[in-house]
A protein has these predicted regions:
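Extended hydrophobic leader/signal-anchor segments used for secretion and membrane insertion
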Residues: 1-169
Length: 169
């Protein structure tokens, strides 16, 4: 997808989000324009309990949102669609570029993004604390997720994302 098309789709996604959140309500639909999960329309439903592998809509915390916006990855206010990879009590490790959960290799991080810019790095093992989650789209090697920015507060989860229509259908 060209950068121009990506910008148009991201703007469309932000518009849908803005229109769906008027009055403080949880957004009901999100248009995903990234390749991290299939491109398409997703319905956001309440998630009372999260499970590993579940696809969720996440509103990045302020510092992460500013980083994503400043670097042109995602405008402020637009949620990300990510899979839950680890929940409280699970151990997540980054050893070099390898991400492992409870001793099982789940994927690789990259040193640089598609434009050649260095990506955030953390190393070592972390037990996911109560109130946190680790999100990673392991099926997409280029996904910008917890393999770079670490665990997120579970409160950042807007809800469960269910595909309504995607380009894979």
């Amino acid at each position: 997808m060209s950068a121009r098309c990506g910008t148009i789709f991201t703007t469309f996604a932000a518009t849908i989000l803005l229109l769906s959140t008027v009055g403080g309500a949880t957004p009901h639909y999100i248009w995903n324009a990234s390749n991290s999960v299939p491109i398409g329309l997703y319905r956001v439903q309440p998630a009372t309990q999260l499970t590993v592998t579940e696809l969720v809509a996440v509103q990045p915390p302020d510092l992460l949102a500013a980083f994503l916006d400043l670097n042109g990855y995602l405008p402020v206010g637009v949620p990300m669609l990510k899979r839950v990879l680890a929940l409280p009590g699970q151990t997540v490790c980054r050893n070099g570029l390898t991400i492992a959960v409870d001793g099982i290799d789940m994927g690789q991080a990259h040193e640089r993004d598609g434009r050649g810019r260095p990506l955030p790095v953390w190393q070592g093992c972390r037990v996911i604390a109560g109130g946190d989650i680790f999100v990673m789209n392991w099926q997409c090697a280029d996904s910008l997720d917890s393999r770079y920015f670490g665990p997120l507060p579970a409160s950042a989860v807007i809800g469960r994302a269910v595909a309504v229509w995607t380009d894979e259908e």
